[in-house]
UniProtKB/Swiss-Prot annotation:
Subunit structure: G proteins are composed of 3 units; alpha, beta and gamma. The alpha chain contains the guanine nucleotide binding site.
Gene Ontology terms: biological process: adenylate cyclase-modulating G protein-coupled receptor signaling pathway
The keyword tRNA processing is assigned to this record: no
The protein's name: Guanine nucleotide-binding protein alpha-6 subunit
Family: Belongs to the G-alpha family.
Region of interest called G3 motif, as start-end residue ranges on this chain: 193-202
Keyword DNA-binding recorded: no
Binding site for Mg(2+): 45, 178
Organism: Dictyostelium discoideum (Social amoeba)
G-alpha domain boundaries: 30-347
Region (G1 motif): 33-46
Length: 347
């Protein structure tokens, strides 16, 4: 009987130790940090905003949505100004009745102007100008617009209404440069994560070093549709080349030896449309495959994954559409398992 008693005691101790280990793992998982990185305009901040929707079942408050209004108005003004300047540079004439209007519109200072009904009406009038429309068709080849420009141009009638309140989709597409470090605590299936979004422009990257401690995973976002675009900071540098170079640096960094590397090849929807207008061979002269999404996307995926030095390092790649909540929700469910599994292995 004494033997059985001792055995039961050992079993009890063993169970307590096991429980303690599980509790420690839960505690460790409770501070899981995920770093969201990528070059400027890759769409990573849009993915960050998606977390708000996923975390609260899409329940952005009316007040929170209204806060995006000014950003959207600024987006509209600046992008129409880009079109007006591009039309003049290319040599496309606007309709005679809109020439003076376009000059006045260029005088608007987006950083200080207050949106009015008149500005809204003038924005609609300019967007409907045949010369502006012709200029718009030459985007990417002659000049660059924000990814969300077409979306807001096509929704100008709604956006310029007096009682306008941005929709969640409007908020997702509102373009604002991330400066500094933004954090969000999110929970997926009882797993707590701290998502850290850091500005992707070159001037912001020096701040990344402060985020490298105890990172369980790095989500790197690269824009698929940017293969024919130049950096805003340096027009002599191709965006995809810059993104690839940056990913190589991150993938092989000593800081992330024990971190999961998750690659989001983003803007899949825009990439599919871009291929119809701009063949991939215009960027990669050595590419000899078909100009289809399947062929080119696989080529790009292999190109990114080939930069790792350690052959045993796993890169988890996903094709994403940052403005599609269902797509991001599905992807996050997949990567949650990757992150949790990776962290559990380390404990």
């Amino acid at each position: 009987m004494a033997f059985l008693c001792k055995s039961n005691d050992n079993t009890k101790v063993s169970m307590e130790i096991e429980k303690s280990i599980k509790d420690d793992k839960r505690t460790f998982l409770g501070i899981t940090q995920v770093l969201l990185l990528g070059a400027g305009e890759s769409g990573k901040s849009t993915i960050f905003k998606q977390l708000k929707i996923l975390q609260e079942n899409g329940l952005w408050t009316t007040k929170e949505l209204q806060e995006f209004s000014n950003t959207i108005y600024i987006n509209i003004i600046t992008q129409l100004q880009v079109l007006i300047n591009a039309a003049e540079s290319i040599g496309i004439q606007l309709q005679p009745e809109n020439i003076q209007l376009s000059k006045d519109y260029l005088e608007l200072n987006h950083s200080s102007v207050t949106w009015t009904k008149e500005i809204g009406e003038n924005s609609v009038r300019l967007w409907n100008d045949s010369g502006i429309k012709s200029t718009f068709e030459k985007r990417d080849k002659e000049f660059q617009l924000n990814d969300s420009a077409e979306y807001f141009f096509n929704n100008l009638q709604r956006v310029t209404q007096d009682n306008y309140i941005p929709t969640p989709q409007d908020a997702l597409r509102a373009r604002v440069t991330t400066k500094g470090i933004i954090e969000a605590d999110v929970t997926f299936d009882n797993i707590n994560m701290k998502i850290i979004d850091v500005g992707g422009q070159r001037s912001q990257r020096r701040k990344w070093i402060h985020c490298f401690d105890k990172v369980s995973a790095v989500i790197y976002v690269a824009g698929l549709s940017e293969y024919d675009q130049a950096l805003r900071e340096d027009i002599n540098v191709n965006k995809m080349d810059e993104s690839l170079s940056l990913f190589k640096e991150i993938c092989n960094s000593k800081w992330f030896d024990s971190s999961s590397i998750i690659l989001f090849l983003n803007k899949k929807d825009m990439f599919i449309e871009k291929l119809k207008r701009v063949p991939f061979k215009t960027y990669d002269k050595k590419y000899t495959g078909e100009n289809s999404f399947e062929a080119v996307s696989l080529h790009i995926q292999r190109k990114f994954e080939s930069v790792k030095i350690d052959p045993n390092k796993k890169i988890y790649t996903h094709f994403t559409i940052a403005v599609d909540t269902e797509n991001i929700e599905f992807v996050f469910k997949v990567i949650k398992k990757i992150i949790v599994g990776h962290v559990m292995d380390l404990v």
